[in-house]
């Protein structure tokens, strides 16, 4: 059976790019895997054209923020519930929190994944994880070394661990 893997890094453009080598590493380790990435709306375009990502799941933060500002709490609750239901339908085998914050940890927990791993979990997000990998295990002299360290800890191939951002043919022209 193919692995269904969810990566969660909701925001921070640079960190999303720094974490991008993990997608290829997971694909090399699990060639039949389905890779999904949960990301906040403003950053979805960074991942949308990556051919190795099967699905970019967009956290509808703008809609939820508008409903909250308009004090439409029941509509907000319905939207959040529908989103969680849709997320769980994927039946993820593995969810990895690349952000380590409570907001990303909650989504990893709500994903219903049978295995949940957090990178440097803090703010209480470790309570949603089965395993936490120390963010400081990487080489501090190398920027974003925590993602390389995470890959090594998960037994992923790291021989080619280079950052990549896929762009649409229109954007490349």
Residue ranges of model-derived segments:
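Catalytic machinery of carbohydrate-active enzymes
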Residues: 1-173
């Amino acid at each position: 059976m193919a692995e269904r893997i969810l990566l969660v890094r909701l925001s921070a453009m640079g960190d999303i790019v720094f974490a991008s080598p993990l997608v290829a590493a997971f694909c090399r380790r699990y060639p039949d895997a389905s890779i999904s990435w949960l990301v906040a709306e403003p950053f979805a375009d960074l991942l949308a054209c990556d051919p190795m990502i099967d699905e970019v799941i967009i956290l509808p933060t703008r809609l939820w923020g508008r409903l909250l500002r308009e004090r439409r709490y029941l509509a907000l609750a319905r939207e959040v519930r529908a989103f969680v239901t849709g997320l769980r339908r994927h039946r993820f085998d593995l969810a990895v929190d690349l952000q380590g914050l409570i907001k990303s940890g909650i989504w990893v927990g709500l994903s219903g994944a049978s295995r949940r791993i957090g990178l440097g979990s803090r703010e209480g997000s470790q309570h949603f994880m089965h395993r936490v990998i120390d963010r400081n295990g990487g080489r501090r002299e190398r920027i974003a070394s925590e993602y390389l360290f995470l890959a090594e800890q998960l037994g992923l191939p790291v021989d080619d661990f280079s950052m990549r951002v896929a762009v649409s043919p229109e954007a490349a022209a």
